[in-house]
Amino acid sequence: MTLSFVTRWRDELPETYTALSPTPLNNARLIWHNTELANTLSIPSSLFKNGAGVWGGEALLPGMSPLAQVYSGHQFGVWAGQLGDGRGILLGEQLLADGTTMDWHLKGAGLTPYSRMGDGRAVLRSTIRESLASEAMHYLGIPTTRALSIVTSDSPVYRETAEPGAMLMRVAPSHLRFGHFEHFYYRRESEKVRQLADFAIRHYWSHLADDEDKYRLWFSDVVARTASLIAQWQTVGFAHGVMNTDNMSLLGLTLDYGPFGFLDDYEPGFICNHSDHQGRYSFDNQPAVALWNLQRLAQTLSPFVAVDALNEALDSYQQVLLTHYGERMRQKLGFMTEQKEDNALLNELFSLMARERSDYTRTFRMLSLTEQHSAASPLRDEFIDRAAFDDWFARYRGRLQQDEVSDSERQQLMQSVNPALVLRNWLAQRAIEAAEKGDMTELHRLHEALRNPFSDRDDDYVSRPPDWGKRLEVSCSS
């Protein structure tokens, strides 16, 4: 089957990119590819059998027209000016059978006009982390970019130390970022901001294209998508780590995996990025930061969208987020209905978990095994203050009994939303260290495990992290 590529970005947004081709690595070789995703995209298996090829920037497929996009943004709350694809190249937009498109974005593809002081490269460590994280999030049901392939090489790339240079093929329906809009707004080119909005509506919100109120309705949906995404992050204990406006997806996708982390111990103020000295992007601050970022996006639209309409959309953010978050947390607790005491029970559990530094994922997974007519709980032994847990658990059991559903029905619901497996940093690190020594077994094994996060396991993927695996410091260097 021949793959078809279109050039919508190149043709319709001519001042938003620089056309250029990838710069190959030395002795590049394919070490992993996503068979399931490749099948979904109807990619012939033969493309993965002939060396690095397109996956390593050594070849282009017919119809591809590579380019690097320009955008700007606020980083850690401060205007950073022009940024752009400093090491990534959009190879092409694949046209799928249903008429939608999928960007093929090659990360680590070499220098671009937007590389600034960088070298245009990515390292094996960061490409493995992004591939694992994006696929983990996908199988958790959270909107995200996807990973299609990883190529490693003999080219040294210098970060804190010399590391193997690598490339990641990332795919997504669009790489539109808040920062694209900021770039032209701060250049006082509001007509180009409008062109970006029209492009987005035409291709991703086409049902609004002929509506006279299209900009307000579109921005309201961007707000809702962002609120829903952040709510989902919070329910699984995911910390992004670097929520700059240039890392915010217009489509509400999880984008740009850098120093991310899933909670081990329940620590509301968890900071996964060791460069975040003020905790701006801490776990519990993510909802507020996302709203701040949406406000920056709204500002770029103010020359052609009424400020009252923008503020009305922004005002809906909190309620949308709380609605999504509340619904999912009730499911995690096994509540089939909504009762007035639900929030208090959840907050008391969180307080108990924070005091005891309980493991976030294990606590909710073990709670899924609760039998409402049994005073015993498999979770009890996880707590030192048994009296405090017993007091909470007695009230929790009483709340479960209000719903009048069987244990099996409730447990089935809980186990479908409380994962047994998340991508803890130590699991990723173990796969990385093996891969850097040339052993890809753990990389493939972990990828396979992450496809079934809600299935019980009896291996160390679902155990508490070892001492060395706690509080692993992760930087933005990639």
UniProtKB/Swiss-Prot annotation:
Pfam families: SelO. GO terms for molecular function: AMPylase activity; ATP binding; magnesium ion binding. Changing residue 246 to A/N: Loss of AMPylation activity. Its cofactor is Mg(2+); Mn(2+). InterPro entries: adnlytase_SelO, SelO. Changing residue 247 to A: Loss of AMPylation activity. The active site is at 246 (proton acceptor). Keywords: ATP-binding, Disulfide bond, Magnesium, Manganese, Metal-binding, Nucleotide-binding, Nucleotidyltransferase, Stress response, Transferase. Disulfide bonds join 272-476. GO terms for biological process: protein adenylylation. Belongs to the SELO family. This is Protein nucleotidyltransferase SelO. It comes from Escherichia coli (strain K12).
